[in-house]
Amino acid sequence: MLMEEIMDNPLYLYDLEYKNVIGVDEAGRGPLAGPVVAAAVILKEYTEELDEINDSKKLTEKKREKLYDIIMKNFDVAVGISTVEEIDKLNILNADFLAMRRALKDLKSLKNEKEYTVLVDGNLKIKEYIGKQLPIVKGDAKSLSIAAASIIAKVTRDRLMKDLANIYPDYSFEKHKGYGTKTHIEAIKDKGAIEGVHRKVFLRKILETEEEKTK
């Protein structure tokens, strides 16, 4: 990879401003069902293939799946998961932080937290993490490492929701991935919530809102 080609990639240039960067992002903060998944990544080698990486929300599912394999090849990757039970117990923000800490803990090339700067998507630092952190609002559109973490987290979670769809075919998890679509809410009303799959606190709020609409 020629330096002039690297200079054309603003996402990579952002990461170059810091020494030893880790990108962290999550997927699944807003759904009514399923876990929250966080990913932490460290770039091993920059290749031209990585120029296709962008914010996971702007990519098609097929494109994310393709980039997932490219990222796994070029980054050291770890994933952390917080369960529905943990989300209900801790609240979604703290469950988010827990998933992120788990991902960071499992990064094989992270030997000393103090040698790295964690670039985390959003405006908050990860609670109870001792290493240096830099929260970046809309970081998945600014940093290559955060964008890569975003894709890993999203693809991993989508796959988990498809697995749940095989177990509970009446809920169409493979389509809405646990989000509060009309189809999903109607399935919950008709068939009930699934213990350990649906988030009780989230459901209470959404069903109360739906009830208000009918008054």
UniProtKB/Swiss-Prot annotation:
UniProt keyword annotations, A-Z: Cytoplasm, Endonuclease, Hydrolase, Manganese, Metal-binding, Nuclease
GO molecular function terms noted in the UniProt entry: manganese ion binding; RNA binding; RNA-DNA hybrid ribonuclease activity
Cofactor binding, per record: Manganese or magnesium. Binds 1 divalent metal ion per monomer in the absence of substrate. May bind a second metal ion after substrate binding.
Catalytically driven reaction(s): Endonucleolytic cleavage to 5'-phosphomonoester
Cofactor field: Mn(2+); Mg(2+)
Amino acids binding a divalent metal cation: 25-26, 121
Heme as UniProt keyword: no
Family: Belongs to the RNase HII family.
Cited NCBIfam families: PRK00015.1-3 (NF000595)
Name under which the protein is recorded: Ribonuclease HII
Organism: Fusobacterium nucleatum subsp. nucleatum (strain ATCC 25586 / DSM 15643 / BCRC 10681 / CIP 101130 / JCM 8532 / KCTC 2640 / LMG 13131 / VPI 4355)
